[in-house]
Amino acid sequence: DWIGAAIPLFNSAEIIRWNCRKTYLRTLEERGADLIPTVWLDDPSGVDAAGLFDALDTDRLVFKRQTGGGAHGQFRLRRGEALPQMTQPMMVQPYLQTIEREGELSFIFIDGQLSHALLKRAAPGDYRIQSLYGGTETAIEANNADVNAARGILETLDQLPLYARVDMLRGNDGKLLLMELELIEPYLYPQEGPGVGRMMADALMKRL
């Protein structure tokens, strides 16, 4: 906060602090964003695994830390498997096969305008799309419906961020669902969108 009080800060300290923990997704859902169904485990000790499968109506789950990135501490679980010990607040979602069939869609926005979009695919046999695990990224021409779905996420915010990456996964019904809204220090994939640097500079100058 003291840095933001001394100099212009984009994105703002307020929005960065809010974005640090994935519970921000709950706020976005309350404002109308379409999310993957999620159970929040603020205290994961003594969790009934069978109850989670039943609550989310699935036989495969994904567990993610509420604070963290890069799929660190993330794991999948099938119904009947032993639940590993968890020591941090977690979020639990049904495992969607679309991560394997299509992949994750990322939309890069600068000051509310789309810079570029890309498709991130996991390595064969994996579901994590990060390059650390063998994932790949490819620039795509996203259709208007998908771009509007991603832009709609930004429209739920109290303030328009200078930069944002909206990561989405298609549900079984074909609708895009929000996975992450990256507002702190997202990688903006300049190789897939070489114009993003100029776009960012122009947007920043308009704000100063």
Regions found by a protein language model. Give the residues of each.
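Active-site nucleotide/adenylate-binding loops and adjacent lid/helix of ATP-dependent enzymes
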Residues: 2-6, 13-102, 144-147, 208
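Phosphate-binding site of ATP-dependent enzymes
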Residues: 67-158, 177
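Tryptophan-centric aromatic hotspots in well-structured domains and transmembrane helices
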Residues: 1, 18, 24, 40, ...
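Anionic group-transfer/hydrolysis microenvironments
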Residues: 39, 66, 95-96, 108, ...
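ATP-dependent carboxylate activation and anion-phosphoryl transfer catalytic cores
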Residues: 144-208
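Short glycine-enriched loops at secondary-structure junctions
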Residues: 15-18, 120-122, 169-173
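A short, local hydrophobic-aromatic micro-motif
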Residues: 36-37, 93, 115, 164-166, ...
